[in-house]
Amino acid sequence: TLSSRRDRQMTIILTPFMSCSAKLPIYAFFTSVFFPGKGALIMIFLYVFGILTGIIFALILKGSLFKGEPVPFVMELPNYRMPGAKNVCQLLWEKAKDFLQRAFTVIFVATIVIWFLQTFDLRFNIVTESKDSILAILAGYIAPIFNPLGFGDWRISTALISGFMAKESVVSTLSILYGSTQSLLMSLTTPAALSLLIFCLLYTPCIAAIAAIKRELNGKWALIVVFGQCLIAWLASFVVYHLILLVF
């Protein structure tokens, strides 16, 4: 509904910095395990951190890629009326149909790829242990990237990759790979857990959001968002992790 293409692009790019409901299970899980009794404080911190990151990045974009005078926002408010059930259903169907037609292909392909990587090993045999899957092997190569952030474990990398499909799957994947919260507690320090929460807050949104970005902008911008947010998440986690180590 934004008339300015500049404002519309910036809104689409910045929206993933905000916490969505799919990230709440991650927050709840880690706060209960690593920060018992301080869950509300950690939750508020994560929400505020995401908002501040979005504001800072918006100011950077306004001064670089999206320079220009802001378009005055004037909206004429219509007379409010109770919508009819038929109109509501028709509008919902049109929006859902449009999303499915444009985004379903991307979501379907990504789902198949993740399922395949989780199910088979390098010889294309069905795995009985998650650690033998292609996804776990790939995660093992990626894991060293996260060593400076305090969580260079292949199991966490596997969970983050699965989170690309749906953020809720991060918790379920960790539960399967670690087996118990005690194993997770032994694997991660408290600063590393907060660093991981920051990364989960800011790294690439799920495939459905990426498909929506591709639909509204284009494939190039979707890739920029994916890699850009991963870089921002890495830098933010690095700073938070090492600041905590310095202070405590």
Can you say where each PLM-predicted feature lies in the sequence?
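Membrane-embedded alpha-helical segments of transport systems
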Residues: 11-28, 45-54, 164-171, 201-205, ...
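Short amphipathic alpha-helical coupling elements at transmembrane boundaries
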Residues: 87-98, 140-148
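Small-residue-enriched core segments of transmembrane alpha-helices in multipass membrane transport
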Residues: 16-19, 34-35, 40-57, 128-147, ...
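Hydrophobic core segments of alpha-helical transmembrane domains in multi-pass membrane transport
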Residues: 31-33, 47-61, 107-120, 196-202, ...
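Juxtamembrane inter-helical linkers in multi-pass membrane proteins
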Residues: 67-91
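Transmembrane helix-loop junctions at the membrane interface of multipass transporters and ion channels
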Residues: 17, 21-44, 208-217, 239-248
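Membrane-interface helix starts
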Residues: 97-109, 152-157
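Extended, low-charge hydrophobic alpha-helical regions
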Residues: 1-11, 112-230
